[in-house]
Regions:
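Short loop/turn microsegments at loop-to-beta-strand junctions
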Residues: 18, 46, 51-52, 96, ...
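Short, acidic, Ser/Thr-enriched surface-loop or helix-capping motifs
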Residues: 15, 58, 106, 157-158
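AMP-binding/adenylate-forming catalytic core of the ANL superfamily
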Residues: 26, 31-32, 39-42, 54-144, ...
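Ser/Thr-glycine-rich phosphate-binding loops at phosphate-binding pockets of nucleotides
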Residues: 9, 51, 75, 158-160
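Short proline/glycine- and acidic-rich turn/helix-capping motifs at secondary-structure junctions
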Residues: 149-159
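Short, small-residue-biased leader/transition segments that mark boundaries at the very start
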Residues: 1-9
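AMP-binding/adenylate-forming core of the ANL superfamily
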Residues: 14-29, 48, 54-55
Length: 187
């Protein structure tokens, strides 16, 4: 970001992940949450604004987006970014779309579950599911790859095209769906 001092906390060497932090004070920075000063104050640590985005810095000093901190899946001692898993799944020739969540599991904390929309001409059957699971394990490793895959006709997205992972998770766990005003196709 031109003119804005950035860092990723607590990164000290290249290719480590951390939360993207910005020095406040640029003209377009938001000034607070309406009627929630405590929430706004929690966004700052040591003079840095914590964005909630995870990033890694490469050897040239460039930052690469990893995912949202609140989307991170904690599974068997690993921190898994859903974007990483979704991107790998999208490389499979049968996969048109993918959305990934963490599903509570008493043994490993959360298991990685993927919701997949298939490309035309591919069957939503056990063989396809096993093929995609195997593909993901080879790309990501057994600890990061999904343990479950569910085929869907569509993945819920916001009007701006972002996957609504919180909605996938709420529906999976039978929880209230919350605010759907940004859901693509809602009126």
């Amino acid at each position: 970001m031109t003119g804005v001092q950035t860092c990723a906390l607590p990164i000290s060497r290249p290719d480590e992940e951390g939360e993207l932090a910005l020095r406040p004070g640029w003209p377009s920075m938001f000034r607070g949450y309406l009627h929630e000063p405590e929430r706004y104050a929690k966004c700052f640590v040591g003079g840095w604004y914590l964005t909630g985005d995870l990033a890694r810095r490469d050897a040239d000093g460039y930052f690469w987006f990893v995912g949202r901190a609140d989307d991170i899946i904690k599974t068997a001692g690993h921190m898994v970014g859903p974007f990483e898993v979704e991107s790998a799944l999208m490389e499979h020739p049968a996969v048109a779309e993918a959305g990934v969540i963490g599903k509570p599991d008493p043994t490993i904390g959360e298991l990685v579950k993927a919701f997949v929309v298939l490309k035309p001409g591919h069957a939503a059957d056990e063989q396809t599911r096993l093929d995609i699971l195997g593909f993901a394990r080879k790309r990501l490793g057994a600890a990061v790859a999904p343990k479950e895959i569910e085929f869907k006709d569509q993945i819920p997205r916001t009007r701006s095209g972002k996957i609504m992972r919180r909605l996938l998770k709420a529906r999976e766990l039978g929880l209230p769906e919350g605010d759907l005003s940004t859901l693509e196709g809602s009126s």
